[in-house]
């Protein structure tokens, strides 16, 4: 699973998820992409589940690029612990994804296979998604 090798601060503020993605809105590496149409945090487990769903459907054919990385930690207190006495322990890692961001790209497969692979991957993610093609240069 994707996790940072080391971080400067173990506990981060949650932050705001306003507006669109600044960059990464086009298909850069592959022929087809999976674009988020809503904003959310995506955990490293959800990214891995989507990747497995895509690669299994494509039967190891083609190439997959993951264009998001879970660099933000989130914390949680243990069950049954009262409020107060500091922030909880780091629980996991998330990638903040804003609307418009292309999260996955594929190349080397037909459009029908790519569409179905992205449909299966979209069911594993907490955001609404759409299929996008690379723009002709």
Curated annotation (Swiss-Prot):
InterPro entries with a match to the protein in the record: Ribosomal_uL16 (IPR047873), Ribosomal_uL16_bact-type (IPR000114), Ribosomal_uL16_CS (IPR020798), Ribosomal_uL16_dom (IPR016180), Ribosomal_uL16_sf (IPR036920)
DNA repair is among the record's keywords: no
Could you list this entry's UniProt keywords, alphabetically sorted: Ribonucleoprotein, Ribosomal protein, RNA-binding, rRNA-binding, tRNA-binding
Q: Name one GO cellular component term.
A: cytosolic large ribosomal subunit
Q: Which GO terms describe its molecular function?
A: rRNA binding; structural constituent of ribosome; tRNA binding
Which regions form coiled coils? none
For this protein, the record's Pfam families field holds: Ribosomal_L16
Q: Which GO terms describe its biological process?
A: translation
Show the PANTHER family listed in the entry: 50S/60S RIBOSOMAL PROTEIN L16 (PTHR12220), LARGE RIBOSOMAL SUBUNIT PROTEIN UL16M (PTHR12220:SF13)
As for family, the record states: Belongs to the universal ribosomal protein uL16 family.
Quaternary state and interactors: Part of the 50S ribosomal subunit.
* Role summary: Binds 23S rRNA and is also seen to make contacts with the A and possibly P site tRNAs.
Q: What is this protein called?
A: Large ribosomal subunit protein uL16
């Amino acid at each position: 699973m994707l996790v940072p090798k080391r971080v400067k601060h173990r506990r981060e503020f949650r932050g705001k998820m306003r507006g669109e993605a600044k960059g990464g809105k086009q298909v850069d590496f592959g022929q087809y992409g999976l674009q988020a149409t809503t904003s959310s945090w995506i955990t490293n487990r959800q990214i891995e589940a989507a990747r497995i769903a895509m690669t299994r459907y494509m039967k190891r054919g083609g190439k997959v690029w993951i264009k998001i990385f879970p660099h933000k930690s989130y914390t949680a207190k243990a069950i049954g612990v009262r409020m107060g006495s500091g922030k909880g322990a780091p629980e996991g890692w998330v990638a903040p994804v804003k609307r418009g961001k292309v999260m996955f790209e594929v190349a080397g497969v037909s459009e029908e296979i790519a569409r179905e692979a992205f449909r299966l991957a979209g069911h594993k993610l907490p955001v609404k998604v759409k299929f996008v093609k690379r723009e002709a240069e």
